[in-house]
């Protein structure tokens, strides 16, 4: 993948960049793996706003992704590499020998025509999925399960990867992209390799309208709201916030305030905390 730049024909195009989509092999998704995706605009079942800055955007269809990778012993051939509007990573369509088709996260280096496997007998090659106890120390992995059989939950975004650091009893030590070192059950599965489309983070949106195409609504500063809408609101002109520290719209301290629950049950699995930004 390469980053495509545009001539500054307008102010919106001046710094805009996009992917050249060189890795994409087809623009037509597999129809049997599509599901309707209704827009919620950040509202819950009562119609109340629960997630800010959501709404609008281009119509999408959801691609059903196989995060479990549980087709043990059945070879699968990579048929296509496709764009997925619902995630930053690309996806790969796999045609299995028993006739089933599934989408998986496209790893870096995965190519059309390549054969992939799942299970204990699989080789340590890009795209293959194994239990963590069967993966050698030092291997780069992605799409990691947190509970056996639940499906991959960690390391699924474009360009991300984790590394196996060691094995202790029924747990395996994993270093995540954030620098956090975590213990995960050895019977959980992961996929070999780094997630593809690694230059996604270099894309410059360029203009506000492009964010709206993606379903992102504007972020309004609290200081320009009314006092009933935000703790920073009100006052005459460009007034200071009038608080000891910045506050969230719900009156909680923000910008550096720790929000992780104290005595979280998963604390015992974290060996080293993530790197500070």
UniProtKB/Swiss-Prot annotation:
Membrane spanning stretches: none
Molecular function GO labels: RNA binding; rRNA binding; structural constituent of ribosome; transferase activity
Family: Belongs to the universal ribosomal protein uL2 family.
InterPro entries: NA-bd_OB-fold (IPR012340), Rib_uL2_dom2 (IPR014722), Ribosomal_uL2 (IPR002171), Ribosomal_uL2_bac/org-type (IPR005880), Ribosomal_uL2_C (IPR022669), Ribosomal_uL2_CS (IPR022671), Ribosomal_uL2_dom3 (IPR014726), Ribosomal_uL2_RNA-bd_dom (IPR022666)
Self-association and partners: Part of the 50S ribosomal subunit. Forms a bridge to the 30S subunit in the 70S ribosome.
Keyword annotations of the record: Ribonucleoprotein, Ribosomal protein, RNA-binding, rRNA-binding
BP GO terms, sorted: cytoplasmic translation
Positions of region (Disordered): 24-55, 221-277
Stated name of the protein: Large ribosomal subunit protein uL2
Role noted for this protein: One of the primary rRNA binding proteins. Required for association of the 30S and 50S subunits to form the 70S ribosome, for tRNA binding and peptide bond formation. It has been suggested to have peptidyltransferase activity; this is somewhat controversial. Makes several contacts with the 16S rRNA in the 70S ribosome.
Database matches in PANTHER family: LARGE RIBOSOMAL SUBUNIT PROTEIN UL2M (PTHR13691:SF5), RIBOSOMAL PROTEIN L2 (PTHR13691)
SMART domains to which the protein is assigned, alphabetical: Ribosomal_L2, Ribosomal_L2_C
Keyword RNA-binding part of the UniProt annotation: yes
One GO CC term, this protein: large ribosomal subunit
Keyword Oxidoreductase appears in the UniProt entry: no
HAMAP family on file: Ribosomal_uL2_B
Record organism: Listeria monocytogenes serovar 1/2a (strain ATCC BAA-679 / EGD-e)
